[in-house]
């Protein structure tokens, strides 16, 4: 294999995909165990990436059972075999739990079937059981080959030629129960299904003043129950990893009746299917219902969500995750040597990593062992930083301490929304208000952005005022794009009048510019010498200092859903190309990631300049595509990608150049991208990042015991962002150099590295820098104290 590298300007070496060849290799791809949404996206990525590098790729139908049975269950795939499957839930190649593969005879048959097709590279998409099976198969491989040779089923030449089996795993499981991975394929989509059901149930529960007990899947892992409880603001949640303390029955009934007393018309209780008490006895949804009915007399209903959670369309997150994992899996197989251990490709923050399969499985089994031995604190820690943080955040927001038990700080904190509306803003406000109150502050809501601030539209906001805000789209406080520059005097007066000691700004690029203006005004107005922090919230995802913004995931899902419908329309019409315009200002995040999630043929963005030759090349590419069985095209265009190559221009060009081959339609998605109920990701991201911002404010205010302290240092006016896996508070003054103010985007954007991935999956030859790939990372049990906790 010609694995060349080239020297980069920094002196390190860079590795490019075009230097990796799969010629002469055969890859088998199978899905095993329970199905999960997004598996098809992973299969598609493996097949297309495999073909792209010159390897043969085989579908192994019906999981390990198909491998044992052989025959028509192992079929060579081509480019078109995986067309139109991105948006389909489940797995098109079937999945089964195989008893035969658990026996040596079964594995012997499987090895024979693979050898006859020259397959020595396996890509397994499944849970921990499926991946463990693959590793056992790999360990036994040479012994199986020798046995087959002795039985005369293969010759000695084949034993030499196919001496090693390479195995790469991708975790496809809605439970998110695999240690070492931030998110498994299917988890985000399962959260979507749960939240869709909860949102629907809330309307009927409010109408009748009912209590609903919802049972969610996850076997012995409480991840789905926990994140859905956080995303809907459930009254109580039962998890296997963190059982309720003795006397929980009475505590729960008190909590439910308190909420009813505060005019809350419904109660939601979420139960993980593996929920237990501290003595490892099961807690069932029926038992909880009986308790509520007998103790409180509430009209109570049980809803068991069941296999609804496995079904439906994969979310944008799962499609992108699975596509990235599929490509990374093929790279791992190409680079594998006989000494390379079986690995799992996974996501850490927004980075693809490879982890040793055996270590991950052992650690996953340790969680179950800890639960069996009733070491529940250890079980929560072994689940990872993210799980622990989710649990702590849920507890802080769900349970209000009595007023006499909260130590008052005598500080007033203002919360304000700035910029365009973004789904998840309200979840962020709710979280900030409740964490602030729990920390002893008085919380003030500022209505209608800086405009409202100047006019004195400021009101104290209490714990109960923000109940039910998590699932609301848009901005309840109201938000405007107006900057504070021309209202500095008035805003300073309002800060003085209401004695504001700190400000939390939730918004987009305008909020960032506003923060810079307030920072510059500190010299003239001492009122602005208070801690200020901004939480990024914009569909455009263009705020410097953060890889993600609240609202971008919801917008991405809206774009993906719309593209799915449009593709279906184009499939029915045949020979039709759709040009779709997305929002984002000059930032191409939505167009690029939407293109990856929807399976677009091209995506035009400002960050990658294009000319008429590129447009011509795309038209020719689509003309060739129309000669195949896939007679439709999808092209995304960011609204500000080019001053002259407008959506109308591109539409007219495609219409003229494609005359006689395909016809063309255009669709401007517009403000629908800002609306709708927030996705589970945006609800929880908003909740957690806002809680972290309030913790920072509390810490800063504690630095100033006297009333007179003025905050003038740069580190007292920050943007809170996520970079890779870390939560960073970055002074706005430092972020200036990282910002392209003319185009309102950061100078460096992480997602541009994924740009070639979309092109490869759309059958374009391109250069792809894979320098970040290839490191086998050890599985960490816990992050050290110096490592910032994951959001």
Curated annotation (Swiss-Prot):
Its main location: cytoplasm. GO terms for molecular function: 6-phosphofructokinase activity; AMP binding; ATP binding; fructose-6-phosphate binding; identical protein binding; metal ion binding; monosaccharide binding. It is found in: Cytoplasm. Residues 412-791 are annotated as: C-terminal regulatory PFK domain 2. The modification Phosphotyrosine is found at residue 651. It catalyses: beta-D-fructose 6-phosphate + ATP = beta-D-fructose 1,6-bisphosphate + ADP + H(+). Residues 400-411 are annotated as: Interdomain linker. Pathway: Carbohydrate degradation; glycolysis; D-glyceraldehyde 3-phosphate and glycerone phosphate from D-glucose: step 3/4. It comes from the Eukaryota. Beta-D-fructose 2,6-bisphosphate binds at residues 481, 538-542, 576, 583-585, 639, 665, 671-674, 744. The modification Phosphoserine is found at residues 6, 12, 21, 142, 386. One of its GO terms (biological process) is canonical glycolysis. GlcNAcylation decreases enzyme activity. The keyword Ubl conjugation does not apply. InterPro entries: 6-Pfructokinase_euk (IPR009161), ATP_PFK (IPR022953), PFK_vert-type (IPR041914), Phosphofructokinase_CS (IPR015912), Phosphofructokinase_dom (IPR000023), PKF_sf (IPR035966). Residues 1-399 are annotated as: N-terminal catalytic PFK domain 1. Glycans are attached at residue 540. ATP binds at residues 34, 97-98, 127-130. The active site is at 175 (proton acceptor). Keywords: Acetylation, Allosteric enzyme, ATP-binding, Cytoplasm, Glycolysis, Glycoprotein, Kinase, Magnesium, Metal-binding, Nucleotide-binding, Phosphoprotein, Transferase. The modification N-acetylmethionine is found at residue 1. Catalyzes the phosphorylation of D-fructose 6-phosphate to fructose 1,6-bisphosphate by ATP, the first committing step of glycolysis. Homo- and heterotetramers. Phosphofructokinase (PFK) enzyme functions as a tetramer composed of different combinations of 3 types of subunits, called PFKM (M), PFKL (L) and PFKP (P). The composition of the PFK tetramer differs according to the tissue type it is present in. The kinetic and regulatory properties of the tetrameric enzyme are dependent on the subunit composition, hence can vary across tissues. Interacts with ATG4B; promoting phosphorylation of ATG4B. Belongs to the phosphofructokinase type A (PFKA) family. ATP-dependent PFK group I subfamily. Eukaryotic two domain clade 'E' sub-subfamily. PANTHER family: ATP-DEPENDENT 6-PHOSPHOFRUCTOKINASE, PLATELET TYPE, PHOSPHOFRUCTOKINASE. This is ATP-dependent 6-phosphofructokinase, platelet type. It comes from Oryctolagus cuniculus (Rabbit).
